[in-house]
Amino acid sequence: MPRLLIHVEGETEETFVNEALAPHLYGFGYQKISARLLGNSRNRNRRGGIRGWNSVRDDIVNHLKEDAGCLATTMVDYYALPAETGPKEWPGRRLATQRPFPQRATTVQQALLEDICTELGDHFNPTRFIPYVMMHEFEGLLFSDCTRFAEAIGRPQLGTQFQAIRDAFSSPEEINDDMLTAPSKRVEALVPGYEKPLLGTLAILEIGLDTIREQCPNFRAWVEQLERWVQ
């Protein structure tokens, strides 16, 4: 039975995988599903933040080499990826800025896959690495059902305000204007002291993966790939 390791950006995503995504995917035949913060164990930042690609690639490649029966994937925020030229730059990140919004995440995902395949050589099965890049923060997914989001965090009166934010965008995955209006910043403005890992996970469990998949096409495509891999 296959094993899945999800390389995540921060503690919020790590908790999401362990509490919400893994229980769903176990029903498709995985033997083990775990999350690992990007970078090596000595330098992990449990508050999030993306390391340079060279370091992350080494982590992913080592995992794929050490366990021939595993699948690797990522869960990272596009806007947090280093784009500057040099060893920290993530493949496809600068190119993606020249693409229409719907193509930006897939541009980076394809570049990451190509780089991993190049590193591992011709004998590597590319289906063993499924990169996933969220256009914005994890909190964007929570706007898939604003009423349940507000209820889950104990602020039911905020449902209307959350919905007003959601209605300004085509999908929850597009909620952002700049660094000051990222999804988490919008939530924190309405919920002082918002605790991302705890409240975010409570909201995800209340909203449910089915609703998020319905509202967030990139997320849906990723989960469907993970489901199909073991079928």
What is each model feature region?
Residues 1, 14-43, 57-231:
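C-terminal accessory helical subdomains adjacent to catalytic cores in phosphodiester-
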Residues 6-15:
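Catalytic nucleophile-elbow at a beta strand-turn-alpha helix junction centered on a G-D-S/GDSL motif
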Residues 43-55:
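Charged, often glycine-rich, active-site loop that binds/positions anionic groups
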